[in-house]
Amino acid sequence: MGPPPPLRRQRLLLPRPSRRRPPARLASGRRSSRPGSSWTWYATLIASLVWYPTVSSTTLEATVVSSTDGGATGQASGGGGGGAGDSTPSESPETSADTTVPRERVTGTEWVSNLTSERYPYRICSMSQGTDIVRFARTITCAPYDAKSVSTEGIMLIYKANIVPYTFDVFTYQKELFFQRSYAYIYTTYLLGNSREHVALPLWEVDAANIWNYCYSSYVRTIGTEQYVSYHQDSYRNETMWLIPEEYQSGNTRRYVTVKDQYHVYGSTWLYKETCSMNCIVTQTKAKSKYPYDYFALSSGLVVEASPFYDTVNGHTFHENRRKFHVREQYRMLERFGAVNAPVRVVPKMAFLERPDIVLAWEIKEPKNVTCHLALWETVNRAIRTEHATSFHFVSRGLTATFVTAKANETLYNNSRYDCIRDSANRTIDRVFREEYDGKYELDGDPVIFTTNGGLTVVWQGLRQKALAALSALAGIPGANGTTNHSRHRRDTAAIAAREHASDLTYAQLQFAYDTIRDYVNQAIGHIAEAWCLEQRRTGEMLHELSKINPSSMLTAIYDRPIAARLAGDVIALAKCVEVDQDTVQVQRDMRKFETSVDGTEEQGQFCYSRPVVLFRFVNSSETQYGQLGEDNEILLGTFRTEACQLPSLKIFVAGKVAYEYRDYLYKRQIDLDSIDVVNTMISLKVEPLENTDFQVLELYSRGELKSANVFDLEDIMREYNAHKLRLRYITSKIVNPIPPFMRGLDDFMSGLGAAGKGLGLVLGAVGGAVASVVGGFVSFFTNPFGSLTLIILVVAVVVIVFLLYQRQRSAVRQPLDFFFPYLAQQTQRHQQTVTTTEYLDSPPPYAERDSYKSGPPDPAAEGLGGSGALPGSSATAATKYTTEDAWQMLLAIRRLDEEKREVPTMVAPSARPPSQQGPGLLDRIRRRGYRRLRDTGSDSELA
């Protein structure tokens, strides 16, 4: 228990020591007052200084009139220190009071300030006038609990939707045409590609496979007006091929083929060739069809949009090509394929469906002989049917489930929908009745069928005790099943079909739990309500009588708020209490009443206050009022409530969240309310707890049923797929390591050098990878046949170019003048017969000044060589010996001749620079090898 809550202003003053007197002196009624006592004077001074702003030391007088009987019960007068003696009354129709109290000693240390309130505020209820009138109800009637439910016993059969599909055998017939194309190189043969095509066998070949266990090695296809024939191994012969079992089988599929290896022959070198391999495939597999059997699916994943029971005349679903559908009766076929002399069986009705790539065949059977859309789930030997406003509740405590159905029902007999369960349901009901009820009960009507909200089907057979049946017969009441009172009609087939796919037992278990809890709670609440009603009636009578003693307390407890009430005849008048300023409420520490003797001294009288004196103010008022502390923080006006002083005395008064203890009418201490025991007046309601109900985990469908529910079995499909994969003979795989070995070694080496080496290795690796990629590209290009051919052409072209350059260079070396000056040879041949030779014996031929070497353009008027017209190479000059100067002059003449011959291109492009201003070209450098260039200016004498 914690400490008491702190007061608001924390100014609780201790009692004055002068008031702590021995009990003997208190009993005498005398009070010692010695002015010479220093500690008494000091305490009085401190108290006067502290409480002077709040409490006036003037004489106060008060007159209080009782609010109960309308008369005055007491009056007191007294005097005190000087001060205001006038009073300000606060009147009401029954109570009047002024602001004076009997003259007594009042100091600041005699008050407990900063009080708290917990439930009700400090208020005055005796001043209020009643405005509202109430009375207690005394005519309360209590009705007993009635469940209002009709229950019937019976036998219940619960059927679930049969989610296991109809499974049957299907035969498929097809031919696989495999075309392989290849290219033969010198030493290597490349498989360029292949195509695989599946085609359907014609019906006559299907009959041959079913009866004789073989098919043919050719296939004819008509496209437009043309026929295309393919032969196995390109033999161009139509031969029979026997069916043999394939090695790869599964639990639901058996496959028979004619060849196990694919045929292919390579062509000649540098030639393409395409071959054909033909394989007949007969497959015996399983197909599944789910209610309402509108389609079925094979284990390979193939779906047929037709009912397996369609025979061209019944009304079952069929959405395939009717022209490709055939039905044969009394059809003969082998019991198994791939065997020699296998037995033959006769199928009453066989269906064939042709598709472009496959032929399917299956046996047609009667649906009622092989299928049923309902399956028995549970048999409840003892069940209860409870009738409600719009529904029936079928309760099975053994299953801990409640099944809710509508009141509409169907009969088990004369209903074709339930032909598949009628016989078994009747046998089960008869067996349960003989074992459980024979001799005590009798059947109440015929079995009827209900459909639950969870999608289940309930077959209900009502029962009735033989004793009740005999009484009903004596009373003339016709015995009938409870279900016959309701209309029976045929439900919509579409609604029932939708209902059968929504089975869920969670709803049934939840409904059972709700019904169990509802019945228990409703019964308990009904009994509690009845007992509560009786208790309220008794309590009303008791409160009516107690209100005659203290109406305010009774009405405050009833309305749970402060109310001022008083009797007004046979009714009660109500009014609201007046709240005071909560911060100004203070309680006096001394409950003794003092009187003034003849000599003017204050002495304790024979009477003490029965309740502590309270000091307070009204809201929006500065005048201090006095009263006495009542119950629940109520302030009683006046201080006339006294009693004869009794010693020893112990009184505890509750104010807010705390209590004040007074011993011998003096304040002792403050007590926490939690430390005071409470008298418990609460009447406990004893209700039996709800009994434990262990819910059972119900399994509507087993794992096998759930696995078989889907027409597509993933396991079978994957096994079939893997079987096809194992049949692939040629699997090409190529693993290329893009990192060359030397690059990996370089990377390991660089990584050992640290961070710098690793970074450098990354750079070198990138560069090396790029180089390797480029080189690899060239290598792969040249290893390709087209790349090799291109390389050969390039090599031949390079050889031819080198040979031509070699011949040209050789011609230039052998005849440089003819090579570099081809026009000179042409001119020599043209003027060979007309040119004369001038012979110079002793001195060189004279040269004109214009014939000297100049850097400027040549003179267009100059013709011939030296003006004589003699041509070099003539017979005359050949025998003549020339000096060095003559050779020099000849070269100058050749230069001028070359410039003249090249003058024509210069005239075509006038914007180009003249030859004299252009730098020496390759031809000039070749012609002038071994010579030095002469100066542009100078006479012929300077040449020497």
From Swiss-Prot:
Residues 56-785 are virion surface. Residues 182-188, 267-274 are annotated as: Involved in fusion and/or binding to host membrane. Residues 807-944 are intravirion. Residues 731-783, 762-782 are annotated as: Hydrophobic membrane proximal region. A motif (Internalization motif) lies at residues 931-934. Residues 71-85 have a biased composition (Gly residues). Disulfide bonds join 125-577, 142-533, 215-280, 372-420, 608-645. It holds the Pfam family Glycoprot_B_PH2. The record marks 491-492 as: Cleavage. It comes from the Viruses. A proteolytic cleavage by host furin generates two subunits that remain linked by disulfide bonds. GO terms for cellular component: host cell endosome membrane; host cell Golgi membrane; host cell plasma membrane; membrane; viral envelope; virion membrane. SUPFAM superfamilies: Viral glycoprotein ectodomain-like (SSF161008). The chain crosses the membrane at residues 786-806. Residues 1-37, 68-108, 834-878, 902-944 are annotated as: Disordered. GO terms for biological process: symbiont entry into host cell; virion attachment to host cell. Its main location: virion. Envelope glycoprotein that forms spikes at the surface of virion envelope. Essential for the initial attachment to heparan sulfate moieties of the host cell surface proteoglycans. Involved in fusion of viral and cellular membranes leading to virus entry into the host cell. Following initial binding to its host receptors, membrane fusion is mediated by the fusion machinery composed at least of gB and the heterodimer gH/gL. May be involved in the fusion between the virion envelope and the outer nuclear membrane during virion egress. Belongs to the herpesviridae glycoprotein B family. This is Envelope glycoprotein B. It comes from Tupaiid herpesvirus (strain 2).
